[in-house]
């Protein structure tokens, strides 16, 4: 068997799994509305200008076949795919939650970054599709916690030698950051907080326009 045939089978298998998962989501959540957000190729650019280390731990080598599979998944007409070159998928989901009124909005992702969207009241729940459970929504702002503690998945270090115990006291104004720590904290807040995207209103209009065509 040649390599081309194997690649074609891989693409077909990924597309089949993708379609099956979307159909399952619609059944499990009793809805015909599933919106899928994708990372734009240059979506993280402005964040990396603030924190160059942002997502520097993501290795894309050897994943060309996977990217081709995902490209074809995005082209499936029966799914509502949202992809904008200069925006990350997280930003797109935030915009979707701002744009959609009335309907109950449930974010389906294993990513804790979306806790902030529920905390802001823009979505009602966050469902982890891996554990198959709804995430408990903490009282403390996830933006503040991650800005101090960091986030290894995004290669963000946070404030040095500060952890969850410090955060609990910090939000009660029992402890404080020095000037150098404040600078680190504020940069992390800009990068982590989806509401801090300087282009969020531009994205909102793009999302609204696409929603009218669905």
Describe these PLM feature segments.
Residues 2, 45-50, 116-120:
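A short acidic (Asp/Glu
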Residues 5-8, 31, 56-213:
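Extended two-metal-dependent nuclease catalytic cores across DNA- and RNA-processing enzymes
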